[in-house]
UniProtKB/Swiss-Prot annotation:
Gene3D superfamilies: Mur ligase, C-terminal domain, Mur-like, catalytic domain, NAD(P)-binding Rossmann-like Domain. Cell wall formation. Catalyzes the addition of glutamate to the nucleotide precursor UDP-N-acetylmuramoyl-L-alanine (UMA). GO terms for cellular component: cytoplasm. Keywords: ATP-binding, Cell cycle, Cell division, Cell shape, Cell wall biogenesis/degradation, Cytoplasm, Ligase, Nucleotide-binding, Peptidoglycan synthesis. GO terms for biological process: cell division; cell wall organization; peptidoglycan biosynthetic process; regulation of cell shape. This is UDP-N-acetylmuramoylalanine--D-glutamate ligase. Pathway: Cell wall biogenesis; peptidoglycan biosynthesis. The keyword rRNA-binding does not apply. It catalyses: UDP-N-acetyl-alpha-D-muramoyl-L-alanine + D-glutamate + ATP = UDP-N-acetyl-alpha-D-muramoyl-L-alanyl-D-glutamate + ADP + phosphate + H(+). The keyword Protease does not apply. It is found in: Cytoplasm. Belongs to the MurCDEF family.
Amino acid sequence: MIPVRGLEGRKVAVLGLGRSGLATARALQAGGAEPLLWDDSPEARANAEGQGFAVTDLTRERAFEDVALLVTSPGIPHLYPAPNPVIARAMAAGVPVDNDIGLFFRSFATRDWDAFDQMPRVVCVTGSNGKSTTTALIHHILAESGRPTQMAGNIGRGVLDLDPARDGEVVVLELSSYQTDLARALTPDVAVFTNLSPDHLDRHGGMGGYFAAKRRLFAEGGPDRAVIGVDEPEGLYLAGQLSVAPEDDRVIRISAGQKLERFGWAVFARKGFLAEWRKGRQMASIDLRAMPGLPGAHNHQNACAAYAACRTLGLAPRQIEEALGSFKGLPHRSQLVGERNGVRFVNDSKATNVDSAAKALQAFPKIRWIAGGLGKDGGIAALRPHLDAVVKAYLIGHSARDFALQMGATDHEICETMDRAVVRAAEEAQPGEVVLLAPAAASFDQYPNFEKRGEDFMERVKALL
Protein backbone atom coordinates (compact mmCIF):
# COMPACT_ATOMS: atom_id res chain seq x y z
CA MET A 1 0.00 0.00 0.00
CA ILE A 2 1.08 3.61 -0.66
CA PRO A 3 0.04 5.66 2.42
CA VAL A 4 -1.31 9.07 1.38
CA ARG A 5 0.80 11.86 2.85
CA GLY A 6 0.07 15.49 3.66
CA LEU A 7 -3.48 15.00 4.98
CA GLU A 8 -2.71 13.81 8.51
CA GLY A 9 -5.60 14.53 10.89
CA ARG A 10 -7.76 15.96 8.08
CA LYS A 11 -11.18 14.77 6.91
CA VAL A 12 -11.15 13.49 3.33
CA ALA A 13 -14.38 12.55 1.52
CA VAL A 14 -14.28 9.52 -0.79
CA LEU A 15 -17.00 9.19 -3.45
CA GLY A 16 -17.43 5.80 -5.14
CA LEU A 17 -16.67 2.60 -3.25
CA GLY A 18 -15.50 0.22 -5.93
CA ARG A 19 -11.96 -1.15 -6.14
CA SER A 20 -10.21 2.22 -6.36
CA GLY A 21 -12.46 3.91 -3.78
CA LEU A 22 -11.83 1.35 -1.04
CA ALA A 23 -8.10 1.25 -1.85
CA THR A 24 -8.06 5.05 -1.54
CA ALA A 25 -9.81 4.88 1.84
CA ARG A 26 -7.26 2.37 3.15
CA ALA A 27 -4.34 4.47 1.90
CA LEU A 28 -5.78 7.65 3.44
CA GLN A 29 -6.27 5.89 6.76
CA ALA A 30 -2.72 4.51 6.65
CA GLY A 31 -1.41 8.03 6.11
CA GLY A 32 -3.28 9.43 9.12
CA ALA A 33 -6.28 11.03 7.39
CA GLU A 34 -9.93 10.48 8.38
CA PRO A 35 -11.78 9.12 5.31
CA LEU A 36 -15.53 9.77 5.01
CA LEU A 37 -17.05 7.36 2.48
CA TRP A 38 -20.14 7.56 0.28
CA ASP A 39 -21.67 5.66 -2.62
CA ASP A 40 -25.17 5.81 -4.11
CA SER A 41 -25.37 2.02 -3.78
CA PRO A 42 -26.64 0.73 -0.40
CA GLU A 43 -24.75 -2.52 -1.02
CA ALA A 44 -21.47 -0.65 -1.54
CA ARG A 45 -22.04 1.39 1.62
CA ALA A 46 -22.80 -1.74 3.65
CA ASN A 47 -19.64 -3.40 2.32
CA ALA A 48 -17.54 -0.38 3.36
CA GLU A 49 -19.09 -0.33 6.84
CA GLY A 50 -18.39 -4.05 7.13
CA GLN A 51 -14.71 -3.24 6.55
CA GLY A 52 -14.75 -0.73 9.41
CA PHE A 53 -14.99 2.53 7.47
CA ALA A 54 -17.17 5.50 8.41
CA VAL A 55 -19.95 6.11 5.87
CA THR A 56 -21.16 9.71 5.66
CA ASP A 57 -24.04 11.01 3.54
CA LEU A 58 -22.26 13.45 1.22
CA THR A 59 -25.57 14.48 -0.38
CA ARG A 60 -26.76 16.34 2.73
CA GLU A 61 -26.45 20.08 3.33
CA ARG A 62 -23.14 21.20 4.85
CA ALA A 63 -21.65 17.75 4.21
CA PHE A 64 -18.34 19.36 3.25
CA GLU A 65 -17.76 21.47 6.33
CA ASP A 66 -14.21 20.86 7.60
CA VAL A 67 -13.48 18.52 4.67
CA ALA A 68 -10.02 19.07 3.16
CA LEU A 69 -10.47 17.13 -0.08
CA LEU A 70 -12.93 15.06 -2.12
CA VAL A 71 -11.47 11.99 -3.85
CA THR A 72 -13.71 10.55 -6.56
CA SER A 73 -13.67 7.36 -8.61
CA PRO A 74 -12.92 7.69 -12.36
CA GLY A 75 -16.36 6.58 -13.56
CA ILE A 76 -18.16 9.47 -11.85
CA PRO A 77 -18.61 12.60 -14.05
CA HIS A 78 -17.21 15.80 -12.60
CA LEU A 79 -18.05 18.15 -15.49
CA TYR A 80 -19.76 16.60 -18.55
CA PRO A 81 -22.48 15.71 -19.37
CA ALA A 82 -23.32 17.11 -15.91
CA PRO A 83 -21.37 17.05 -12.64
CA ASN A 84 -22.37 14.44 -10.11
CA PRO A 85 -24.41 16.25 -7.40
CA VAL A 86 -21.88 15.37 -4.69
CA ILE A 87 -18.99 16.73 -6.77
CA ALA A 88 -21.02 19.85 -7.60
CA ARG A 89 -21.65 20.37 -3.87
CA ALA A 90 -17.94 20.00 -3.08
CA MET A 91 -16.93 22.47 -5.80
CA ALA A 92 -19.54 24.97 -4.58
CA ALA A 93 -18.04 24.68 -1.09
CA GLY A 94 -14.55 25.32 -2.46
CA VAL A 95 -13.33 21.81 -1.62
CA PRO A 96 -10.61 20.56 -4.02
CA VAL A 97 -11.44 17.44 -6.05
CA ASP A 98 -8.82 14.78 -6.84
CA ASN A 99 -8.58 11.07 -7.65
CA ASP A 100 -6.34 8.17 -6.64
CA ILE A 101 -3.86 8.97 -9.42
CA GLY A 102 -3.26 12.45 -8.02
CA LEU A 103 -2.86 11.03 -4.51
CA PHE A 104 -0.37 8.47 -5.82
CA PHE A 105 1.90 11.10 -7.35
CA ARG A 106 1.86 13.24 -4.19
CA SER A 107 2.73 10.22 -2.00
CA PHE A 108 4.88 7.80 -4.04
CA ALA A 109 8.32 9.27 -3.31
CA THR A 110 9.60 8.67 0.24
CA ARG A 111 12.63 9.73 2.28
CA ASP A 112 14.22 6.27 2.17
CA TRP A 113 14.80 6.75 -1.56
CA ASP A 114 17.95 8.70 -0.58
CA ALA A 115 19.58 5.36 0.25
CA PHE A 116 18.75 3.81 -3.13
CA ASP A 117 21.44 3.28 -5.75
CA GLN A 118 18.89 3.86 -8.52
CA MET A 119 15.77 6.00 -8.15
CA PRO A 120 12.39 4.34 -8.84
CA ARG A 121 10.73 5.48 -12.07
CA VAL A 122 7.11 5.84 -13.18
CA VAL A 123 5.98 5.17 -16.76
CA CYS A 124 2.44 6.25 -17.70
CA VAL A 125 0.58 5.11 -20.82
CA THR A 126 -2.47 6.87 -22.24
CA GLY A 127 -4.30 7.04 -25.58
CA SER A 128 -7.51 5.72 -27.12
CA ASN A 129 -6.44 2.22 -28.18
CA GLY A 130 -3.58 -0.06 -27.25
CA LYS A 131 -3.11 1.30 -23.72
CA SER A 132 -3.56 -2.00 -21.93
CA THR A 133 -1.41 -4.03 -24.32
CA THR A 134 1.35 -1.40 -24.30
CA THR A 135 1.29 -1.17 -20.50
CA ALA A 136 1.37 -4.96 -20.09
CA LEU A 137 4.12 -5.23 -22.70
CA ILE A 138 6.36 -2.68 -20.95
CA HIS A 139 5.80 -4.49 -17.65
CA HIS A 140 6.57 -7.85 -19.28
CA ILE A 141 9.77 -6.61 -20.94
CA LEU A 142 11.03 -5.13 -17.67
CA ALA A 143 10.24 -8.30 -15.71
CA GLU A 144 11.87 -10.54 -18.33
CA SER A 145 14.95 -8.31 -18.22
CA GLY A 146 15.26 -8.66 -14.45
CA ARG A 147 14.11 -5.16 -13.49
CA PRO A 148 11.82 -4.91 -10.45
CA THR A 149 8.45 -3.66 -11.70
CA GLN A 150 4.80 -3.23 -10.75
CA MET A 151 1.77 -2.54 -12.95
CA ALA A 152 -1.42 -0.71 -11.97
CA GLY A 153 -4.00 1.92 -12.90
CA ASN A 154 -6.63 1.03 -15.46
CA ILE A 155 -5.09 -2.46 -15.56
CA GLY A 156 -4.06 -4.67 -12.65
CA ARG A 157 -4.19 -3.23 -9.15
CA GLY A 158 -5.37 0.19 -8.02
CA VAL A 159 -2.41 2.57 -7.80
CA LEU A 160 -2.64 3.04 -4.04
CA ASP A 161 -2.64 -0.75 -3.56
CA LEU A 162 0.92 -0.92 -4.94
CA ASP A 163 3.79 -1.88 -2.67
CA PRO A 164 6.26 0.86 -1.68
CA ALA A 165 8.92 1.19 -4.37
CA ARG A 166 12.16 -0.79 -4.24
CA ASP A 167 15.61 0.30 -5.36
CA GLY A 168 15.54 0.75 -9.17
CA GLU A 169 11.91 -0.31 -9.54
CA VAL A 170 9.74 0.83 -12.46
CA VAL A 171 6.01 1.32 -11.90
CA VAL A 172 3.98 1.13 -15.12
CA LEU A 173 0.53 2.77 -15.07
CA GLU A 174 -2.24 2.63 -17.66
CA LEU A 175 -4.25 5.85 -17.41
CA SER A 176 -7.62 6.55 -19.03
CA SER A 177 -8.84 10.02 -19.94
CA TYR A 178 -11.09 9.91 -16.87
CA GLN A 179 -8.00 9.48 -14.69
CA THR A 180 -5.75 12.06 -16.35
CA ASP A 181 -8.55 14.65 -16.55
CA LEU A 182 -9.02 15.00 -12.80
CA ALA A 183 -5.66 14.13 -11.19
CA ARG A 184 -4.19 17.19 -9.48
CA ALA A 185 -0.64 15.83 -9.80
CA LEU A 186 0.74 14.05 -12.88
CA THR A 187 4.54 13.74 -12.82
CA PRO A 188 5.68 10.57 -14.62
CA ASP A 189 9.30 10.06 -15.64
CA VAL A 190 8.22 8.63 -19.01
CA ALA A 191 4.83 9.27 -20.63
CA VAL A 192 3.42 7.37 -23.62
CA PHE A 193 0.65 8.57 -25.97
CA THR A 194 -0.45 5.72 -28.23
CA ASN A 195 -3.07 7.31 -30.51
CA LEU A 196 -6.38 9.17 -30.46
CA SER A 197 -9.82 8.37 -31.87
CA PRO A 198 -13.32 9.48 -30.80
CA ASP A 199 -14.38 7.88 -27.52
CA HIS A 200 -16.00 8.98 -24.25
CA LEU A 201 -16.89 12.30 -25.89
CA ASP A 202 -19.93 12.80 -23.66
CA ARG A 203 -17.61 12.84 -20.63
CA HIS A 204 -15.28 15.45 -22.11
CA GLY A 205 -17.61 17.81 -23.96
CA GLY A 206 -16.28 16.80 -27.38
CA MET A 207 -13.08 15.75 -29.12
CA GLY A 208 -11.12 18.81 -27.97
CA GLY A 209 -11.88 18.12 -24.33
CA TYR A 210 -11.00 14.45 -24.78
CA PHE A 211 -7.60 15.32 -26.28
CA ALA A 212 -7.00 17.94 -23.57
CA ALA A 213 -7.57 15.29 -20.89
CA LYS A 214 -4.95 13.03 -22.48
CA ARG A 215 -2.54 15.93 -23.02
CA ARG A 216 -2.46 16.76 -19.29
CA LEU A 217 0.00 13.89 -18.84
CA PHE A 218 2.53 15.92 -20.85
CA ALA A 219 2.04 19.31 -19.20
CA GLU A 220 5.00 21.49 -18.21
CA GLY A 221 7.01 19.89 -15.44
CA GLY A 222 5.84 16.50 -16.69
CA PRO A 223 7.86 13.63 -18.15
CA ASP A 224 11.61 13.55 -18.80
CA ARG A 225 10.87 11.54 -21.96
CA ALA A 226 7.73 11.47 -24.09
CA VAL A 227 6.84 8.62 -26.46
CA ILE A 228 4.27 9.92 -28.97
CA GLY A 229 2.32 8.05 -31.63
CA VAL A 230 2.23 10.34 -34.67
CA ASP A 231 -0.17 8.47 -36.96
CA GLU A 232 -2.99 10.92 -36.14
CA PRO A 233 -3.04 14.74 -36.25
CA GLU A 234 -3.27 15.04 -32.47
CA GLY A 235 -0.08 13.03 -31.98
CA LEU A 236 1.74 15.09 -34.59
CA TYR A 237 0.61 18.26 -32.84
CA LEU A 238 1.62 16.98 -29.40
CA ALA A 239 5.07 15.88 -30.57
CA GLY A 240 5.61 19.28 -32.15
CA GLN A 241 4.48 21.10 -29.01
CA LEU A 242 6.88 19.12 -26.82
CA SER A 243 9.92 19.35 -29.13
CA VAL A 244 12.22 22.35 -29.41
CA ALA A 245 13.36 21.07 -32.84
CA PRO A 246 12.95 17.94 -35.01
CA GLU A 247 16.23 16.56 -33.66
CA ASP A 248 15.09 16.91 -30.01
CA ASP A 249 15.53 13.37 -28.65
CA ARG A 250 13.51 13.97 -25.49
CA VAL A 251 10.49 13.18 -27.70
CA ILE A 252 10.44 9.72 -29.31
CA ARG A 253 8.05 9.58 -32.24
CA ILE A 254 6.49 6.20 -33.05
CA SER A 255 4.47 4.99 -36.04
CA ALA A 256 2.93 1.81 -37.41
CA GLY A 257 3.53 2.77 -41.04
CA GLN A 258 5.57 5.96 -41.55
CA LYS A 259 9.32 6.22 -41.94
CA LEU A 260 10.60 8.62 -39.28
CA GLU A 261 14.32 8.64 -40.01
CA ARG A 262 14.79 12.43 -39.95
CA PHE A 263 13.94 12.94 -36.27
CA GLY A 264 16.25 12.93 -33.25
CA TRP A 265 14.78 9.67 -31.94
CA ALA A 266 12.10 7.52 -33.56
CA VAL A 267 10.79 3.96 -33.54
CA PHE A 268 8.56 2.78 -36.37
CA ALA A 269 7.24 -0.42 -37.93
CA ARG A 270 6.95 -1.08 -41.67
CA LYS A 271 6.16 -4.38 -43.41
CA GLY A 272 6.46 -6.25 -40.13
CA PHE A 273 9.86 -4.87 -39.09
CA LEU A 274 10.50 -2.51 -36.18
CA ALA A 275 13.31 0.00 -36.67
CA GLU A 276 14.92 2.35 -34.17
CA TRP A 277 16.57 5.49 -35.56
CA ARG A 278 18.52 8.04 -33.57
CA LYS A 279 20.18 11.16 -34.94
CA GLY A 280 20.18 9.88 -38.51
CA ARG A 281 21.48 6.37 -37.74
CA GLN A 282 19.62 3.08 -37.49
CA MET A 283 20.25 1.59 -34.05
CA ALA A 284 18.25 -1.65 -34.21
CA SER A 285 15.81 -3.75 -36.24
CA ILE A 286 13.37 -6.44 -35.01
CA ASP A 287 11.23 -8.84 -37.06
CA LEU A 288 7.79 -8.46 -35.46
CA ARG A 289 6.33 -11.12 -37.73
CA ALA A 290 8.02 -13.68 -35.47
CA MET A 291 6.12 -12.43 -32.40
CA PRO A 292 2.99 -14.61 -31.98
CA GLY A 293 1.52 -12.42 -29.24
CA LEU A 294 1.59 -9.27 -31.41
CA PRO A 295 -0.41 -9.86 -34.62
CA GLY A 296 -1.40 -6.98 -36.90
CA ALA A 297 -0.28 -3.41 -37.49
CA HIS A 298 -2.04 -2.14 -34.36
CA ASN A 299 0.04 -4.48 -32.21
CA HIS A 300 3.15 -3.40 -34.08
CA GLN A 301 2.37 0.15 -32.95
CA ASN A 302 2.04 -1.15 -29.38
CA ALA A 303 5.41 -2.88 -29.76
CA CYS A 304 7.01 0.36 -30.97
CA ALA A 305 5.64 2.26 -27.97
CA ALA A 306 6.81 -0.36 -25.48
CA TYR A 307 10.21 -0.66 -27.17
CA ALA A 308 10.72 3.11 -27.04
CA ALA A 309 9.69 3.37 -23.39
CA CYS A 310 12.03 0.55 -22.40
CA ARG A 311 14.93 2.08 -24.33
CA THR A 312 14.52 5.28 -22.28
CA LEU A 313 14.87 3.10 -19.17
CA GLY A 314 18.24 1.76 -20.33
CA LEU A 315 17.30 -1.64 -21.75
CA ALA A 316 19.26 -2.96 -24.74
CA PRO A 317 17.53 -3.79 -28.06
CA ARG A 318 18.30 -7.51 -27.74
CA GLN A 319 16.81 -7.66 -24.24
CA ILE A 320 13.62 -6.11 -25.57
CA GLU A 321 13.51 -8.39 -28.62
CA GLU A 322 13.75 -11.52 -26.48
CA ALA A 323 10.93 -10.33 -24.22
CA LEU A 324 8.70 -9.40 -27.17
CA GLY A 325 8.97 -12.97 -28.38
CA SER A 326 7.66 -14.40 -25.10
CA PHE A 327 4.71 -12.00 -24.74
CA LYS A 328 1.42 -13.91 -24.86
CA GLY A 329 -0.91 -10.96 -25.41
CA LEU A 330 -3.89 -9.92 -23.29
CA PRO A 331 -7.33 -11.52 -23.08
CA HIS A 332 -9.96 -10.07 -25.45
CA ARG A 333 -7.34 -8.30 -27.58
CA SER A 334 -6.53 -10.18 -30.81
CA GLN A 335 -6.70 -13.35 -28.70
CA LEU A 336 -6.50 -16.62 -30.63
CA VAL A 337 -9.17 -18.88 -29.13
CA GLY A 338 -8.59 -21.93 -31.31
CA GLU A 339 -8.63 -23.42 -34.80
CA ARG A 340 -10.96 -25.90 -36.54
CA ASN A 341 -10.57 -27.26 -40.06
CA GLY A 342 -8.17 -24.48 -41.01
CA VAL A 343 -10.42 -21.72 -39.60
CA ARG A 344 -9.04 -19.58 -36.77
CA PHE A 345 -11.29 -17.96 -34.14
CA VAL A 346 -10.05 -14.64 -32.72
CA ASN A 347 -11.50 -12.73 -29.76
CA ASP A 348 -11.05 -8.94 -29.96
CA SER A 349 -13.99 -8.00 -27.73
CA LYS A 350 -11.98 -4.97 -26.53
CA ALA A 351 -12.51 -3.44 -30.01
CA THR A 352 -15.35 -1.30 -28.67
CA ASN A 353 -14.98 1.61 -31.10
CA VAL A 354 -14.53 2.11 -34.83
CA ASP A 355 -10.80 2.83 -34.67
CA SER A 356 -9.90 -0.32 -32.74
CA ALA A 357 -12.21 -2.42 -34.94
CA ALA A 358 -10.53 -0.99 -38.06
CA LYS A 359 -7.13 -2.10 -36.77
CA ALA A 360 -8.47 -5.60 -36.06
CA LEU A 361 -9.97 -5.83 -39.56
CA GLN A 362 -6.60 -4.95 -41.09
CA ALA A 363 -4.83 -7.79 -39.27
CA PHE A 364 -6.25 -10.71 -41.30
CA PRO A 365 -6.77 -11.31 -45.06
CA LYS A 366 -10.16 -13.10 -45.00
CA ILE A 367 -12.61 -12.45 -42.19
CA ARG A 368 -15.98 -13.67 -40.98
CA TRP A 369 -16.76 -10.65 -38.84
CA ILE A 370 -18.97 -10.71 -35.73
CA ALA A 371 -19.92 -7.12 -34.90
CA GLY A 372 -22.53 -5.15 -33.01
CA GLY A 373 -23.66 -4.24 -29.54
CA LEU A 374 -24.45 -0.78 -28.23
CA GLY A 375 -23.25 1.37 -31.12
CA LYS A 376 -21.55 4.72 -30.74
CA ASP A 377 -22.16 7.99 -32.61
CA GLY A 378 -21.82 7.47 -36.35
CA GLY A 379 -22.15 3.70 -36.13
CA ILE A 380 -19.70 1.90 -38.44
CA ALA A 381 -19.87 4.25 -41.44
CA ALA A 382 -16.18 5.10 -41.00
CA LEU A 383 -15.29 1.41 -41.35
CA ARG A 384 -16.35 1.10 -45.00
CA PRO A 385 -12.77 1.59 -46.32
CA HIS A 386 -11.65 -1.30 -44.09
CA LEU A 387 -14.22 -3.93 -45.14
CA ASP A 388 -12.35 -5.37 -48.15
CA ALA A 389 -11.16 -8.36 -46.11
CA VAL A 390 -14.66 -9.09 -44.74
CA VAL A 391 -16.19 -12.10 -46.49
CA LYS A 392 -19.39 -11.72 -44.46
CA ALA A 393 -20.54 -9.93 -41.30
CA TYR A 394 -22.71 -11.47 -38.59
CA LEU A 395 -24.44 -8.68 -36.67
CA ILE A 396 -25.55 -8.87 -33.04
CA GLY A 397 -27.06 -6.72 -30.34
CA HIS A 398 -28.93 -3.44 -30.17
CA SER A 399 -27.19 -1.91 -33.19
CA ALA A 400 -27.45 -4.92 -35.52
CA ARG A 401 -30.01 -3.34 -37.85
CA ASP A 402 -28.32 0.06 -37.83
CA PHE A 403 -25.00 -1.58 -38.69
CA ALA A 404 -26.70 -3.54 -41.49
CA LEU A 405 -27.77 -0.27 -43.12
CA GLN A 406 -24.13 0.88 -43.15
CA MET A 407 -22.57 -2.28 -44.58
CA GLY A 408 -22.84 -1.19 -48.21
CA ALA A 409 -22.15 -4.09 -50.59
CA THR A 410 -20.57 -6.27 -47.89
CA ASP A 411 -22.50 -9.50 -47.34
CA HIS A 412 -24.11 -9.60 -43.90
CA GLU A 413 -26.66 -11.39 -41.74
CA ILE A 414 -28.54 -10.17 -38.67
CA CYS A 415 -28.00 -12.81 -35.98
CA GLU A 416 -29.05 -10.84 -32.86
CA THR A 417 -27.19 -13.10 -30.38
CA MET A 418 -23.61 -14.27 -29.93
CA ASP A 419 -24.73 -17.90 -29.94
CA ARG A 420 -26.28 -17.68 -33.41
CA ALA A 421 -23.46 -15.52 -34.80
CA VAL A 422 -20.76 -17.99 -33.77
CA VAL A 423 -22.70 -20.98 -35.12
CA ARG A 424 -23.47 -19.30 -38.47
CA ALA A 425 -19.91 -17.98 -38.94
CA ALA A 426 -18.44 -21.38 -38.11
CA GLU A 427 -20.82 -23.14 -40.51
CA GLU A 428 -19.90 -20.88 -43.43
CA ALA A 429 -16.18 -20.26 -42.81
CA GLN A 430 -13.69 -21.81 -45.24
CA PRO A 431 -10.11 -22.95 -44.55
CA GLY A 432 -7.76 -19.96 -44.31
CA GLU A 433 -10.47 -17.62 -43.01
CA VAL A 434 -10.70 -16.05 -39.55
CA VAL A 435 -13.88 -15.76 -37.49
CA LEU A 436 -13.23 -12.44 -35.75
CA LEU A 437 -15.17 -10.87 -32.89
CA ALA A 438 -14.40 -7.15 -33.18
CA PRO A 439 -17.72 -5.53 -32.21
CA ALA A 440 -17.04 -1.81 -32.92
CA ALA A 441 -19.59 -1.19 -30.16
CA ALA A 442 -19.99 -1.20 -26.40
CA SER A 443 -21.23 -4.35 -24.69
CA PHE A 444 -23.78 -2.95 -22.25
CA ASP A 445 -26.89 -3.92 -24.24
CA GLN A 446 -26.27 -7.64 -23.64
CA TYR A 447 -23.30 -7.92 -21.24
CA PRO A 448 -22.01 -6.10 -18.13
CA ASN A 449 -18.64 -5.42 -19.81
CA PHE A 450 -16.48 -6.33 -22.81
CA GLU A 451 -14.76 -9.07 -20.81
CA LYS A 452 -18.03 -10.99 -20.32
CA ARG A 453 -18.80 -10.58 -24.02
CA GLY A 454 -15.41 -12.01 -24.94
CA GLU A 455 -15.83 -14.88 -22.50
CA ASP A 456 -19.20 -15.73 -24.04
CA PHE A 457 -17.62 -15.80 -27.50
CA MET A 458 -14.80 -18.05 -26.31
CA GLU A 459 -17.13 -20.47 -24.54
CA ARG A 460 -19.27 -20.86 -27.66
CA VAL A 461 -16.22 -21.30 -29.88
CA LYS A 462 -14.68 -23.91 -27.58
CA ALA A 463 -17.96 -25.85 -27.66
CA LEU A 464 -17.46 -26.19 -31.43
CA LEU A 465 -13.79 -27.16 -31.40
